[in-house]
């Protein structure tokens, strides 16, 4: 499935990518599944500000209404934070279903990397990489 027609890149992110300026992709699962509201939203916005303060453009990535989003507004981050675990934790295998159902998804590391690559973003920061568990 070619997902590029479903990709929305925020104007600020698109301009930075086109100009060769630094852009940092951020996953969104940490917002919906990693912390309780409102700390999740406060932390996400603070991380974006730290990136800005250091001369780069943040691009938090998620799937909203079936659209792959590279760069969220503060309102979209708030939406994900309030919905919390009601939002699908979206891995690679979930993309086609979420897009076809016009559903929401908070992106895991894998999905964030895929969408970031589609948007021309080469740098990615995360709060942690899962998949390794004791017991």
Predicted features along the sequence, with ranges:
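Glycine-rich anion/phosphate-binding loop at the beta-strand->alpha-helix junction
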Residues: 102-135
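Glycine/threonine-rich beta-strand-loop-alpha-helix active-site module
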Residues: 3-6, 61, 130-135
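Glycine-rich nucleotide/cofactor/substrate-binding loop typically near the N-terminus or early
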Residues: 28, 33-35, 41-99
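Short beta-strand segments
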Residues: 25-29, 62-64, 117, 124-126
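Glycine-rich, flexible loop/turn motifs
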Residues: 9, 13, 31, 76, ...
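A short, flexible low-complexity segment enriched in Lys/Arg and Gly/Pro that occurs
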Residues: 1-9, 97-109
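N-terminal glycine-/serine-/threonine-rich phosphate-binding loop
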Residues: 1-53, 118-119
């Amino acid at each position: 499935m070619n997902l590029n027609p479903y990709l929305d890149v925020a104007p600020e992110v698109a301009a930075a990518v086109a100009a060769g300026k630094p852009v940092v992709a951020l996953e969104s699962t940490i917002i919906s599944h990693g912390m309780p509201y409102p700390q999740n939203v406060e932390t996400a916005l603070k991380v974006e500000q730290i990136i800005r303060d250091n001369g780069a453009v943040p691009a938090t990535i998620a799937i909203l209404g079936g659209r792959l989003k590279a760069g969220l507004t503060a309102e979209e981050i708030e939406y994900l934070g309030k919905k919390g675990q009601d939002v699908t934790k979206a891995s690679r295998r979930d993309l086609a279903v979420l897009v076809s159902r016009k559903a929401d998804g908070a992106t895991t590391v894998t999905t964030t990397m895929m969408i970031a690559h589609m948007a021309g973003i080469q740098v990615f920061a995360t709060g942690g990489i899962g998949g390794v568990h004791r017991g």
